Amino acid sequence: MSFSSAERTKMVALFHELGPDAPTLCEGWTTRDLAAHLWVRENRLDASAGLFIPALKPRLDTVTEEVLERDYDEVVDDWGKGAHKFNPLRYVDKVLNSAEHFVHHEDIRRANGRTEARDFSAATQNELHLPLKMMGSSFLSKSTLPVVLEAEGFPPIVTADKHGVADKGDAVVRVRGTVSEVLLWAFGRDAAQVQIV
């Protein structure tokens, strides 16, 4: 089972354990909102485009409201089955969902008293490093200072380096921790256990 699939399975169990009204780290969202987001993102590509294209956001909002009106456990179980047979996302699950499932699993865990960071195998850390490397710059593009992401065991990732000073180490923010925690931080989660210097 891939890491992405394992995280999906664990999230389904946690969604059911906590019910639809539990908090998450996603500001303003309950577990019902997060489950609806995950279902729409994976099952309604026409609507999920609204996550990235502002003109399509009204469609996203309409479809999300429809999903929120469905039975919570049914939505969770349907999402838990993964992308349907003819859904193109089924074939890129590992690449597309490793970070998404990890971060949202932590959103649920940490908002509900399970605050300890999890230990992962070297293979999983490698799998989580790829999205950090690919998306770190876009997540931190608005930073006024260069940010150096220093995940343990990996080369530093320099982001938001508009003036070319990061290589010299001047006037930068350094974020240190395991790759999983640095990834959480890059996704904007204050609960990430990182050192910022």
Would you name each region that the model predicts?
Residues 36, 69-73:
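N-terminal accessory alpha/beta regions
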Residues 30-31, 71, 178:
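Short, structural beta-strand-to-alpha-helix junction motif
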Residues 1-50:
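An N-terminal domain-cap segment
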Residues 63-67:
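Acidic catalytic motifs of isoprenoid enzymes
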Residues 3, 17-21, 44-59, 74, ...:
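Structured surface interface patches that mediate subunit assembly and partner/cofactor docking
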